[in-house]
Amino acid sequence: MLDADTTTLGQALTRLRRREQARRREVGMLLPATVFSREMAAEEAHISASYLTQLERDTAAGQVGVGILRQLIDTYHASENDWQYVCDLAGHQAPYPGLAGMSPTMDIPSLEQHLQALTPMMRAEMDEAAADLVSYYTSPQRRLLAANRAYFDVFPDQRPGLYMLEWAFGSPAARDVMITWETDARLGVAWHRGIMGRYGKTEWAQQAHRRLWQFPEFRDMWEAGDVAYAMAKDYVAQVRFDGRAYGMTMENWHLYSVSDAPILRSRGRLYPL
């Protein structure tokens, strides 16, 4: 099995600085041969060059402060997704107690815990949806928990417990069902990067990443460095079902329960394209 490449905070900050270098060259703020060095970046971010060097090399002592991360993000003209990502990598967005700095043997709530968090009312509401309304629940890590008949009509080879991105790369049916497979897969990989930023020290995330790393197209998309945490509100998924093309505009929201197993609720109505 190939060794899977993950991303550290230092690597993420280095990528952002180099991306900002390319942007400045493109808009004429830097000459083509001029480097946006650590020294230049540190001066603009009002930190020392030696500290930025330590951050990029992952040798800085202690946890980097949120204020310093914000200064670097602003200096690099990075997105809010990038901001969330570096905060996750720095351990500032721990979703469960003890996640920041947790040992590799610790893990997120189990699939069984998430399944137990689905109440009979939640399942009934999902099952009673109209035949053209695709409805399902996932964990925050995009593991499928439960879905209605309309969902399984469109995605017949999916099962509860599946990491949905693995299906996109590993199922022979995925490219036929997903009309815009490459666009959807790239979004999924960007979302996976966000998941790895937040949950990457857990055993589940490490195993899922290693399995995905076996797919060459996944590795190529991972190298692009894109990060996401949700679909755009106007994003339309295009699927092929029963020989016809359909669109779905998905609605997503988080549900929280006393079981400490948050759940993502999703639904979208099928309409002919």
Predicted regions mapped to residue ranges:
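A short, Lys/Arg-rich alpha-helix, primarily the initiator
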Residues: M1-S37
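Short amphipathic recognition helices of helix-turn-helix/homeodomain-type DNA-binding modules
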Residues: L2-Q11, G62-A117
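Residues in the recognition helix of alpha-helical DNA-binding motifs
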Residues: L16, E44, L55, V86-L89
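Recognition helix of helix-turn-helix/homeodomain-like DNA-binding domains
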Residues: M29-P32, R38-E39, A45-Q63, Q71-I73
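Extended, Lys/Arg-enriched charged tracts that mediate electrostatic binding to polyanionic substrates
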Residues: I108-M126, G225-D242
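Sensory modules in modular signal-transduction proteins
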Residues: E112-P140, Y151, M164
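PAS-family sensory domains
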Residues: L133, S139-M231, L270-P272
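Low-complexity, glycine/alanine/valine/leucine- and proline-rich hydrophobic stretches
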Residues: V227-L273
